[in-house]
C-alpha cells in the first residue's frame, strides 16, 4: 500500500512532480487517498489502483476504459481530461520506477543485486552465477529466458529486463520467499526506458560490446547503444569488466575510481589453459574447472560470473561446483544424429555471437557444416548485414536462410536481405521445420555438423506482433534424429 502523500513526496524529491489537475483546477498536494495496486495495463484496474499512462503507443481509449472500471487517479505526462485527477510528471518512466520502489517497500535493499550487461552472454553468465550462488545462498534470477523468484520454480520471461512495476513486484516476491540474492540481465533498453531508474547494484558486469540493437525503434547509433550499456557501471558499487572487449581502454578509464576486477586476455584473471570441457584459471579464481558449455567465450562468461559471485559471498568451492553444474536451455545444446553428425542449437542472434559459435563448431567438426539462420523483423536490422559479413569469412559453410520471428515483415524479404550481403549462393527455406529436416537429411557422418542459430530454446515464432505456435529448434531437431 502507498498513500497519495507518499507518492507525491517521492515525485517531488526526484524533481519530477509538476502538478495535480482535477477539472481544470491545479493542486500541489492531496490527502486521504490510499492505493493498494499499481498498474500500467488498463485491463488490470481496481478502484484503488494508481495507474500509469505510459508509452508512445498509449491511447486515450485505454484510460477511458480504466475510468469505466472504477479508476480514480492516474499518473501521466499530460492531462487526458477524463474526469478524474491526473498527477502530472515530466518523466513517466522515472515516476514508475521510484513509486514502485516505495510501494513495495524498497525490496532491493533486502537483496544482494548482481547485474550482467553485454551484447551477448548475459543469459549464460546469469545461469553460471545462479548455480554458483545456490551452493551456499538463496538466489532468485531474472533472465531473458527464464525467471525464478524462489530458486526452484521457473517461468518464461517476457522482457530481458522487466518493466519497473513488474521488476520491483518480483523483487518483493523474492524477498518474501526468503531469497538472499537477485541475479539480473540489464539490457541497454532497460536504461533507455528507465526500467531500472534509481536502482544501485552491488556488482555490475560488462561482458562485451559490438554493434547490435541499432535501428529506428531501438538505439539510433552505436554511441547511444554503448552509452546506455555503460550506465550499469555508473550504477554499480563494484564492477567486473572483460579486458578483451572492444573499447576496453575507454571503459577501464571510466571505472578506474570504482572497486573493480578485470578478466580475460592481458588481465590478472584469465584462462591459462583450456580444453573442450575443462579449463585452468589464474588470478583470484586460480584452479581447475570442469564446464559443460564448450567454447572460449563460455569460459569467459564463467570467469565473469565467478569473480562477481566471489564479491557476493561465494567460495572458490562454490564457484567450481556451480560452473560444473551449469547448462543453459538453447545455449550450445548438442544432439547427435544416428549417423554420428552433431546438431548444435544456439541462441546466437547477432554477428558477433554467430562468429563465436561458428569458431567453436569449426574447431570441433571437420566435415560438412550447414547453418540455419534468420533474423527478426522490425528490430536489430543491422544484424542482417552483420550476418552476411560473418558468413563471408566461413565460405565452406552451407547456409540455409529461414524464418526467425518475422513479426510484421515478410520473412522472405528478410532472408533475401541477409542473402544480399553473402557473396555466394545460399538456399532459402521459409518453413523453419522444413529447413531443419532438409539440413539434417544431408549430413553423412560423425565429422559433419548442423548449426541451428537464432532462436535457442524459444518455442514460438513472433508473427504480426503475436507469439504463434512453433515446437522449438531443439524439439524439431529431435524429431529427425
Swiss-Prot record:
A motif (L-lysine recognition motif) lies at residues 404-407. It comes from the Bacteria. Keywords: ATP-binding, Cell cycle, Cell division, Cell shape, Cell wall biogenesis/degradation, Cytoplasm, Ligase, Nucleotide-binding, Peptidoglycan synthesis. ATP binds at residues 118-124. Its main location: cytoplasm. Gene3D superfamilies: Mur ligase, C-terminal domain, Mur-like, catalytic domain, MurE/MurF, N-terminal domain. Pathway: Cell wall biogenesis; peptidoglycan biosynthesis. GO terms for cellular component: cytoplasm. It catalyses: UDP-N-acetyl-alpha-D-muramoyl-L-alanyl-D-glutamate + L-lysine + ATP = UDP-N-acetyl-alpha-D-muramoyl-L-alanyl-gamma-D-glutamyl-L-lysine + ADP + phosphate + H(+). It is found in: Cytoplasm. PANTHER family: MUR LIGASE FAMILY MEMBER, UDP-N-ACETYLMURAMOYL-L-ALANYL-D-GLUTAMATE--2,6-DIAMINOPIMELATE LIGASE MURE HOMOLOG, CHLOROPLASTIC. Belongs to the MurCDEF family. MurE subfamily. HAMAP family: MurE (MF_00208). This is UDP-N-acetylmuramoyl-L-alanyl-D-glutamate--L-lysine ligase. The gene is murE.
Amino acid at each position: 500500500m502507498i498513500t497519495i502523500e507518499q507518492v507525491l513526496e517521492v515525485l517531488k524529491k526526484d524533481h519530477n512532480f509538476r502538478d495535480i489537475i482535477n477539472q481544470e483546477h491545479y493542486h500541489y498536494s492531496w490527502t486521504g487517498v490510499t492505493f493498494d495496486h499499481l498498474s500500467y495495463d488498463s485491463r488490470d484496474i481496481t478502484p484503488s489502483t494508481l495507474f500509469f499512462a505510459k508509452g508512445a503507443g498509449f491511447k486515450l481509449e485505454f484510460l477511458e476504459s480504466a475510468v469505466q472500471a472504477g479508476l480514480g487517479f492516474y499518473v501521466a505526462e499530460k492531462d487526458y481530461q477524463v474526469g478524474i485527477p491526473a498527477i502530472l510528471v515530466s518523466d513517466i518512466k522515472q515516476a514508475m520506477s521510484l513509486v514502485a520502489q516505495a510501494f513495495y517497500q524498497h525490496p532491493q535493499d533486502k537483496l544482494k543485486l548482481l547485474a550482467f550487461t553485454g551484447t551477448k552472454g548475459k543469459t549464460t553468465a546469469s545461469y553460471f552465477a545462479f548455480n554458483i550462488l545456490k551452493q551456499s545462498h538463496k538466489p532468485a534470477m531474472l533472465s531473458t529466458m527464464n525467471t525464478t523468484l524462489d530458486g526452484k520454480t521457473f517461468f518464461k520471461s517476457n522482457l530481458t529486463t522487466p518493466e519497473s512495476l513488474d521488476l520491483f513486484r518480483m523483487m518483493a516476491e523474492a524477498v518474501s520467499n526468503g531469497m538472499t540474492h537477485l541475479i539480473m540481465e540489464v539490457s541497454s533498453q532497460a536504461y533507455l526506458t528507465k526500467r531500472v531508474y534509481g536502482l544501485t547494484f552491488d556488482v555490475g558486469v560488462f561482458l562485451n560490446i559490438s554493434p547490435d540493437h541499432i535501428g529506428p525503434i531501438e538505439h539510433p547509433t552505436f554511441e547511444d547503444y554503448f552509452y546506455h550499456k555503460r550506465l550499469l557501471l555508473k550504477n554499480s558499487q563494484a564492477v567486473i569488466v572483460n579486458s578483451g572487449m572492444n573499447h576496453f581502454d575507454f571503459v577501464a578509464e571510466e571505472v578506474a575510481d570504482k572497486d573493480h576486477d578485470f578478466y580475460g586476455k592481458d588481465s590478472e584473471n584469465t584462462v591459462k589453459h583450456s580444453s573442450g570441457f575443462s579449463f585452468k584459471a589464474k588470478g583470484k579464481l586460480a584452479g581447475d574447472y570442469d564446464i559443460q558449455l564448450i567454447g572460449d567465450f563460455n569460459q569467459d562468461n564463467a570467469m565473469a560470473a565467478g569473480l562477481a559471485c566471489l564479491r557476493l559471498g561465494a567460495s572458490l568451492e562454490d564457484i567450481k561446483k556451480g560452473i560444473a553444474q551449469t547448462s543453459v536451455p538453447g545455449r550450445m545444446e548438442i544432439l547427435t544424429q544416428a549417423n554420428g553428425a552433431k546438431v548444435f542449437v544456439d541462441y546466437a542472434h547477432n554477428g558477433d555471437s554467430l562468429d563465436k559459435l561458428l569458431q567453436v563448431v569449426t574447431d570441433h567438426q571437420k566435415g560438412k557444416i550447414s547453418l540455419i539462420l534468420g533474423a527478426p523483423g522490425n528490430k536489430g536490422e543491422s544484424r542482417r548485414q552483420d550476418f552476411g559479413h560473418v558468413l563471408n569469412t566461413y565460405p565452406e559453410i552451407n547456409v540455409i536462410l529461414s524464418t526467425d520471428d518475422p513479426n510484421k515483415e515478410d520473412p522472405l524479404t528478410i532472408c533475401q536481405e541477409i542473402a544480399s550481403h553473402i557473396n555466394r549462393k545460399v538456399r532459402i527455406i521459409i518453413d523453419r521445420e522444413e529447413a531443419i529436416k532438409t539440413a539434417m537429411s544431408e549430413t553423412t557422418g560423425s565429422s559433419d555438423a548442423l548449426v541451428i542459430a537464432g532462436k535457442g530454446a524459444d518455442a514460438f515464432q513472433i508473427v504480426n506482433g503475436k507469439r504463434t505456435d512453433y515446437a522449438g529448434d531443439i524439439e524439431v531437431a529431435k524429431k529427425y534424429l
